[in-house]
Amino acid sequence: MNLRGRPKCNFLHLGILPFAVFVLVFFGYLFLSFRSQNLGHPGAVTRNAYLQPRVLKPTRKDVLVLTPWLAPIIWEGTFNIDILNEQFRIRNTTIGLTVFAIKKYVVFLKLFLETAEQHFMVGHKVIYYVFTDRPADVPQVILGAGRQLVVLTVRNYTRWQDVSMHRMEMISHFSERRFLREVDYLVCADADMKFSDHVGVEILSTFFGTLHPGFYSSSREAFTYERRPQSQAYIPWDRGDFYYGGAFFGGSVLEVYHLTKACHEAMMEDKANGIEPVWHDESYLNKYLLYHKPTKVLSPEYLWDQQLLGWPSIMKKLRYVAVPKDHQAIRN
């Protein structure tokens, strides 16, 4: 076998190799530089001055600010909204807000939307998804730039309990068919409320729940969980972290889809067995959140009834509050 030509070939390879390494390093550097600029590291990083966080000076000493599973509990004073706003704007985030205005509840819609325009996700892209059986009664509200309203016509039910429980079915259905393509996060809210102070991107997380204003200081034995073992919403007396309100929850669209789908399926199983939980969809929500821990928990600042509970000093702000009403007149 003639080997005389091989050394020449090896010298050629040795000459090409350094050149190839140089090309890879050069273009790799260009790619990483371009990527860092676009991801805000370091080119787009915030230049706003803000107070340095101090390890030995907690933001709040009067309330719990972290769950045992390391999810933050959001209170006034625990976050810097300027930093958060910039981070979510870099991601070009769009937030969906669902609200059900079925039957007489459509009367609350104007105040709900007007106060949302003043306080909800100001400066960010928002799509309001209004579920209603009365599309002609949806009020005209002036919306800010980057914000839009979508009316989704759905059927009503004779009993208000059925209206409440079928909310999970509708959110699940539209999350799969539509919301996944249109928004990054979904916030699910009750119509008979109003925004009274800032509610912004500090609430956004993979999955969040809100502490019920009536039970935030109570022991688990006082929680009004569903206690019948026959129900899919059943929670034993010795279990439970918090009692969450059904009027304000959300997260990524995918996680909200998983939640609402699981709750709806549990409802259907209970219905087949003639069982209706004590607090309807809220009972299923609490069961789900017990075994699928939220990645963020909102304090009662984000769900309050001032008429019933006043304004305790622990609440620095009341952000999302109940509108005074005659429950019987509205529901019947």
From Swiss-Prot:
A GO CC annotation given for this chain: Golgi cisterna membrane
Protein known as: Histo-blood group ABO system transferase
Species: Mus musculus
Cofactor notes: Binds 1 Mn(2+) ion per subunit.
Lumenal topological segments: 35-332
Reaction catalysed by this enzyme: an alpha-L-fucosyl-(1->2)-beta-D-galactosyl derivative + UDP-N-acetyl-alpha-D-galactosamine = an N-acetyl-alpha-D-galactosaminyl-(1->3)-[alpha-L-fucosyl-(1->2)]-beta-D-galactosyl derivative + UDP + H(+); an alpha-L-fucosyl-(1->2)-beta-D-galactosyl derivative + UDP-alpha-D-galactose = an alpha-D-galactosyl-(1->3)-[alpha-L-fucosyl-(1->2)]-beta-D-galactosyl derivative + UDP + H(+)
Record's comment describing the protein's domains: The conserved DXD motif is involved in cofactor binding. The manganese ion interacts with the beta-phosphate group of UDP and may also have a role in catalysis.
Family under the similarity heading: Belongs to the glycosyltransferase 6 family.
Ranges annotated as spanning the membrane: 14-34
Annotated EC: 2.4.1.40, 2.4.1.37
Cofactor(s) demanded: Mn(2+)
Membrane topology of the entry: Single-pass type II membrane protein
Topological domains, Cytoplasmic: 1-13
Localization: Golgi apparatus, Golgi stack membrane; Secreted
Alphabetized GO MF terms: fucosylgalactoside 3-alpha-galactosyltransferase activity; glycoprotein-fucosylgalactoside alpha-N-acetylgalactosaminyltransferase activity; metal ion binding
Glycosylation sites: N92
